[in-house]
Amino acid sequence: MGEEATAVAAAGVRPELVREAEVSLLECKVCFERFGHWQQRRPRNLPCGHVVCLACVAALAHPRTLGLECPFCRRACRACDTSDCLPVLHLLELLGSTLHASPAALSAAPFAPGTLTCYHAFGGWGTLVNPTGLALCPKTGRVVVVHDGKRRVKIFDSGGGGAHQFGEKGDAAHDVKYPLDVAVTNDCHVVVTDAGDCSLKVFDFFGQIKLVVGKQFSLPWGVEITPHNGVLVTDAEAGTLHLLEADFPEGVLRRIERLQAHLCSPRGLAVSWLTGAIAVLEHPCAFGRTGCNNTRVKVFNSTMQLIGQVDSFGLNLLFPSKVTASAVTFDHQGNVIVADTSGPAIVCLGKPEEFPALKPIITHGLSRPVALAFTKENSLLVLDTASHSIKVFKVMEGNGG
């Protein structure tokens, strides 16, 4: 308190006035956190005149209708009817450095991974052409990418060198026409979704075709492997999520099960090996009006119960610029991580039960991120289709995390 009083006196402001302002004016009366300029703590005017922080607006709002009631007078409104409370923001600027940081806010801040820094990149134009999907081999750490080259599947070693490729561009059943995504099974088989003939194709690591699954899909898009070596596939046109079980070495499909229906153009897909949760990235306007780039992340638990969801509008309440999710993954702590092509950026949404929460972890060095994968060493691989490359990010010393 002595240092705080000295700073206040040096600024020419009476300490008792600052303390009164902090308690009466500069504190959200719902969560009791201090207002601030960073997005979650920005003061927001409700239509009734009461002021709460943006994080509380998002928490109070209904996830679909965005309707909420003022916690003080119970007047109904919508989240989009709120606005920045300029008098409180101006008061924050006037008091400036005389305010000290809230210990609760400081302790709550690091809910997500620290800021990541790019320390390596590989691929590039010619080596890769308009890449669309990225996966890691769980046994060898090799990096598998699907792209628009003459041979559609390219495999790099863990350092980005020693590439070999397969999957000829052609019309034969074992060729790959238009790959959208890729995954690698626990026994090192490469699974590719092919929009060209609406099929799922499985290869061994030498490029030998093992299995082709067609007719069951209208437009297979995202693909991911479960901890039990099942294959999850989203069908963007049918709005479904399927689970396939197969004997990959023998090339025998054991069964296929529809886990979810009535999804809105599901594309990206991720599985948490920590909790078994499944994240699906929807594009509600994909087959609707042009110019609409709204996206939605839905997270289901291992029994396919919905445990969290957030869409572009909800994220925009917490972030100053529009967020358009293009890829989703889980980190090793179970946080949901999305690639944002509007930023461009990589953003942590927190754990599903914490939605909506948001923390940018990569804000520089990207052009158009379209796929994400975490290594066992906790580095994050980002497939940047605009630069035709894979960029490797990790927490550097001094960045926290």
Swiss-Prot record:
E3 ubiquitin-protein ligase. Together with the phosphatase EPM2A/laforin, appears to be involved in the clearance of toxic polyglucosan and protein aggregates via multiple pathways. In complex with EPM2A/laforin and HSP70, suppresses the cellular toxicity of misfolded proteins by promoting their degradation through the ubiquitin-proteasome system (UPS). Ubiquitinates the glycogen-targeting protein phosphatase subunits PPP1R3C/PTG and PPP1R3D in a laforin-dependent manner and targets them for proteasome-dependent degradation, thus decreasing glycogen accumulation. Interacts with AGL. Interacts (via the NHL repeats) with EPM2A/laforin. Forms a complex with EPM2A/laforin and HSP70. Interacts with PRDM8. PROSITE patterns: NHL (PS51125), ZF_RING_1 (PS00518), ZF_RING_2 (PS50089). Its EC number is 2.3.2.27. NHL repeats lie at residues 115-159, 163-206, 207-247, 250-303, 304-352, 353-396. A zinc finger (RING-type) spans 28-74. The RING domain is essential for ubiquitin E3 ligase activity. It catalyses: S-ubiquitinyl-[E2 ubiquitin-conjugating enzyme]-L-cysteine + [acceptor protein]-L-lysine = [E2 ubiquitin-conjugating enzyme]-L-cysteine + N(6)-ubiquitinyl-[acceptor protein]-L-lysine. Disulfide bonds: none annotated. GO terms for cellular component: cytosol; endoplasmic reticulum; nucleoplasm; nucleus; perinuclear region of cytoplasm. It is an enzyme of class 2 (transferase). This is E3 ubiquitin-protein ligase NHLRC1. Disruption phenotype: Significant impairment of motor activity, coordination and balance; spontaneous myoclonic seizures; and decreases in episodic memory. 3- and 6-month old mice contain numerous large insoluble aggregates composed mainly of polyglucosans called Lafora bodies (LBs) in skeletal muscle, liver, heart and brain. Glycogen levels are increased 1.6-fold and 1.2-fold respectively in skeletal muscle and liver of 6-month old mice. Glycogen phosphate levels are increased 1.5-fold in skeletal muscle and liver of 6-month old mice.
